[in-house]
Amino acid sequence: MSPPVASRVGVGVIVTRADGNLLLGYRIKAGETPSWCLPGGHVEPGETFETAALRELREETGIVTQRPADIFAILQQLTARHTAITGAAQVSLEDNLAEPQVTEPDVFARWAWFPQAALPTPLFPASDAVLSLWQSAPCPERWRAYSVL
């Protein structure tokens, strides 16, 4: 008998400042290859993608904003081990004042702002997929995107 297939629903949040730079965290979670990652995480039961995006932003970075989280796509990771659905969100901050904090030192070593044309590598797979779609590039292999109109 094959093992049960797990499903996961998450959200990835592109956070941009007034100067156009976007926020990425250096992810150092045990058992994973270190990579750069958007704020994000699991959607809790009964929670919308928008609510999850703002909650994860607050929990992971300490950034609290009244700006809306706009969902622009739903992405599906196509693997044999599990089904992963990621809501792609964007939050546009009004200024350049937000200073992210490392609130989960077992997951992130640091947060930094990057120009869109100079993103660091490697990117966390889900973040790579969200950013590719946002930049009008093809989705990475084993990902499928569904635009939200």
Could you say what each language-model-derived stretch is?
Residues 7, 34, 83-85:
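Residue-level preference for beta-strand/loop junctions
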Residues 1-22, 42, 74, 87-92:
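Conserved N-terminal beta-strand and adjoining loop/helix that marks the start
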